[in-house]
Amino acid sequence: AGWNTGKEVTYKGSEATYHAYLSEDGKNAWIYLVETTNKTKSLKFPDTVEGAVVTRVGYDTALRKLEDADEFNQNISGVTVEYAHGVDGWSEKTINVESVVLPKNLTILESTALSGLRKVKSITIPDGVQKISAETFYGCKSLKEVKLPKSLASFDNYTSFSACPKLSKVTLSKENKSFKMQKGLLLNKKGTKLIWAVPAKNKITVPDSVTSIADNALKAGKATSVYLGKKVKMIGKDAIAGKKITKVSIAKKNKSIAKQG
């Protein structure tokens, strides 16, 4: 079903006002903008708006008028996010937001949706969300803990949690069919591909089960050293190009990668 973007509905919470569009059949709601003040400490998204179940959160460039087309997206506060220029969407209006509770039936969390919320320490992504998009949590500098959704099937490994230097604990249900977390590393379910590492990890030991490392896998973290396990054969583009990585060592039994400095 499409969305009726010609008519806006609102929900007034205790600390913020949530602006939404309803689906054409009136069953689902899409919250695309939240009005906050510098006194707002909590964003508790409603599960329903006017009887419609909230299934989508964030701003999408499709909402722009064509003449207003812009290469940049916005966060949930309507502030422009420009990753290429280091602009994470921080604003005075969200300066004190410390907690975010997303709608329980959420299925789509747009890119850049929660970027720039610099005081949020932990977040649980509802289990119905299948994709973590680019820059969704970019610049959440205090974020320490994230619970990934059970149905996660797609993950933007480079920018989703970029500029989240304190993020050290990421959990994922063992029932997830696509990925698994292992000692702070996000691997494919078989454990043969390293996709991402939690940003706060200083030393990364690539397990012996891993044969390939995804593009950009370790680019956004603060790791200073990387140890490549004995089965690593393929290293993707910029996979170990993190700015702070100064030491890369290779398992003695690894016959695929020649020792280079």
PLM feature spans:
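Short beta-strand/loop segment at the start of cytosolic alpha/beta domains
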Residues: G2-E35, Q182-L185, K189
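Structural signature of tandem-repeat unit edges
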Residues: E24-G26, N38-T55, E67-I108, R118-K131, ...
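Hydrophobic residues on conserved beta-strands that form the core of alpha/beta folds
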Residues: I31-L33, V54-V57
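Acidic, Ser/Thr
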Residues: V34-T36, D60-E67
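Core beta-strand segments of extracellular beta-sandwich domains
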Residues: T61, T159-F161
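Short, aromatic/basic amphipathic alpha-helical patches
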Residues: T159, A258-G261
